Amino acid sequence: VVIIGCATWALKSDNMARKADIQAKTSQTGRKADAAKTSVENGVQANSEAVKEKTDDKDTSDTTKKTETAEERIARVRQEAVTAGYPEKVIELLDKNPETVQFVEDYGKKKDQAPAATVEAEDGYSGMFPEILQWDERWGYSPYGTSIIAVSGCGPTCVSMLVVGLTGDKTVTPSVVADYATQNHYVDENNDTTWAFMTSGVEHWGLTCRESNGNESEIAKELEAGHPVICSMRPGDFTDIGHFIILTSYNNGNVTICDPFSLENSKKSWNYSQISSQIKAVWVYSK
């Protein structure tokens, strides 16, 4: 009986030991699970805080952009462009025309995009001619010579307006014209469009060109006949160096123009006698 009693006690003791061991392991496992849960929760919280911080930063940035003045925006875009290492000529667009601020701001993310295939119907028109801008993001980032259309492409942009207006072919975009001019050596080492492009170059699209002396009565007659005029401009109201613009209509001494670099200029009516002294060369076009 004693032996049996000892064996029974030993068995109970052994069972108690195993139970204690199981409880200890269970407790340890529970602590590990709790620790893991806490770690996950902390990680989720940290991640949530990081996301919130980024969102807050973005919201702050968006709010800043919404509340900044035009001058403040230009200053911000200029600083961002300098920091990002944008080409100097691109940054200089801000000094020449504040209207280009969106183009400059988007340069980094859009400079390698493919140009638009057509001039769309929603583009504004001056009579029969679309008012196309060389710094339009649809083609302004495209190359011209060793530059880009936004910086140096006033010539190709003027020709694009002529071709679309006179022929109705909306696939002749500034980038198409710039490619043709570059490939056929109508752009010089300074990325300026040669005058030869305004005469022989436009024949590629079936246009007829003749030079004019710029006499006001002659200009009035040609414009009234529906013949647009391209002018090469000296420094003055339109440029500091050189520029091309289109005259589209004449009325009582005033002309309407398409300036490929300035929306503001294109919206004005200009007294021909005021700008005639700034004209270097004149070409008249027809289909």
What are these regions (language model features)?
Residues 12-14, 75, 164, 168-287:
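Conserved active-site-adjacent core of cysteine acyl-enzyme catalytic domains
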Residues 4-186:
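Active-site-adjacent structural segments surrounding the nucleophilic cysteine of cysteine proteases
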